[in-house]
Amino acid sequence: MLKNRIKLVCSDIDGTLIKSDKTIGELTYKAIHELVKRGIHFALVTGRFKTGVLPVMETLSLTDKEISGVYDNGAYVEVLGQPTSSYGVPIPLMFEVSKFASSYNARSVLFSGEEWVVEEKDKWWARINGFYEGRGVCEPFEETVRKSRMRNDSEPIKLVLRLDDDVKMAALKKELNILYPSLSFFLSHPDILEVSLKEVNKASGVSAIADKLGITKDQIMSFGDFDNDVPMLKEAGFGVAMKNGTQCALDAADYIAPSNEEDGVGKTLFSLLL
């Protein structure tokens, strides 16, 4: 039975844990606190940079010393506040990808330290700056790299490509996969293309946490809704997709939960685990 087996619960954030208005359902809030109370480890697994996750932790009334985190789709992992693994795309390669993507009119965004960075303001500036609580910076990317090295950041610099043309995005993704076989390119949103090392994804991040805690694959339960959640849904002993999820996520899951708008994570945890 799941109740006697699961020792680590992992959850995606956007479209899974939180509702479209960025709130967390009452049942989900209670369920996560009950997990922590019972000694079942909980981890947030997301494409967001850690800075973008801190408001979610605040909403949960939990700190990074109480729960673990997989950030940047697996590029940076912390276990109970301690950095565990960090796998960034080499800077020269990152700049090369950014330059090529500009030929498709894709916009590059870097995430570094507590900042997100663009080289020039565009139509996404206000929306992203609001999402990241005013931490946006407009500067040459070379300066971003210099500052990160001066700070000796644990979390690697992350590159994201934004393009709101589905046809162009598909063509760009296809060509990048051919040109850069050592990298992985995947959508975390219809207009957001993530860039990472080939072997790095949410599943590798979850595995890093499990290894550190001495937890086996069959003792992991994971929640997700999008294509980039598929690796961790498959990696977990019990994968749960949200009803609002993509077809790829639904196909990869062992169980379908109510949607994020219906407090699906909380309902499922209380129904199956707590």
Protein language model regions, located:
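Conserved ATPase-coupling elements of RecA-like P-loop NTPase cores
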Residues: 20-24
